[in-house]
Amino acid sequence: MPESRSGRRRLHSRRAVLAAAAVGLGTALTASLSACSSSGDVSSEGITLTFSWWGNDDRAERTKKAVALFEQEHPGVTVRTSNADFGSYMQKLATQAAGGGIPDVAQLDYRQISQYSGGGALLPLDEAVEHGTIRTSEMDEEFLRTGTYEGEQYAVPMGRGITGYAYDSKVYAQAGVPTPQPDWTWEEWADANRKIAALGLKAPGGRTVVGANDNGVNEDIFEDWLRGRGGKLYASRTKLGFTEDDLTEFWTFCDTLREEGAVAEAPDTAQANSTETSPMGRGLAAADFTWDAPFPGYPALLGDQVHFAPVPTTDGRQGAYFKPSMLLGVGAHTDHPEEATALVDFLLNDERAGDILGFTRSTPPNRRIAARVAKTLQGAEREIYQYAQKMEKYGLDAPPAAPPRGDVALQTAFKRAYHRVMYDLTSPREAAREFIDEANRELRS
């Protein structure tokens, strides 16, 4: 629905407030944060901000400590925080957006940017970025653009994530599979799964250990597979970037490996919704695709022999890319845009906040903060930081624009369609045709 004139005036007035406040606020912030002292100039007395995010207990504890430091630096500003698990958070945020307004500052998923920007729930941040109220000089420009919608900045990345492959190095060595490198191929990955299954290793309960989870359900991995071939998920906000033949080939590849017994059985894949419930987490598979942020859960569960490897390639071309693990946005209906953007800047750029938050949201997008915090990392967290550096040197294509509205529904539809393939209810070709028909309807609605 087109934005009303009153809605446009409201957004434009908030832009004017941000622009007018930017220079003075930015100067006051810089002085305050550099001197580690309080300054009443950067806030109005008696202001309460709301700030929400999703994540585990460790992330919650660290975030609250960083927020407490912000409050100390901004007398008169109180930040009321709330957090939940991912699913509950997404439902609540959608309800808030439909009911008149999201929190003053909200943690956002990459897949939500188009939905909430186009729906008028987020405040444009271009002036805040341009005038340095939200400082972005230490962020990669292409990565910063992942928070844009139709050319305007609506959110700023809070973490830089990348897909990878958690694998049991002892099992790989036992099967004679070399350590995966950034240029290993999908064919080599498939052969590795076959070799591991052929070992006949037994999982708890006496079942044979397979090579990996069946990632035909995983749209993120399909995207990596597509990008490695020069393709993409979306050609535009209303059009898919791949064909029925592309998806049929991918699902046939996955389906064949499952039928061979090289990857997990359908029921094991269907119930995988966490590290602990995945085939690898249950000891039924030697590897699994995952994002860097949750990767440390695998060695914590299974032991230090679990390492993080690159996603396979097509002829050496990597399809993985640096994606915002999450972003920060400001609610369009906030009554305190200056203080809200100040909180965003503080969480992204203050060294003390960086020390507190660490890598709880994956690699900090501020290069200086990331390098500073990396010096203290150990174990799995240090490994994912080194992995990101290695992949950056190998060479990755730029990240795509934020997915279009409807992408969240399509991710669910993608998994549902492949479930039918897994349970032999339809063929890869027919499932691909049905999914593309549904996707086209969703994107055009």
Language-model segment annotations:
Residues L69-M139, A173-G176, S278-A287, P365, ...:
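Extracytoplasmic "Venus flytrap"/periplasmic binding protein-like
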Residues Q72, A175, E259-A262, P299-T363, ...:
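Extracytoplasmic/periplasmic substrate-recognition and gating elements
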Residues P103-D104, T133-V171, Q318-A320, Y394-P404:
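A structural signal for short loop-to-beta-strand junctions that line the ligand-binding cleft
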Residues Y110-I162, H307-A309, L377:
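Hinge/lid segment of periplasmic solute-binding proteins
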Residues N193, R237-D268:
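Glycine-centered hinge/linker elements that transmit conformational signals in sensory
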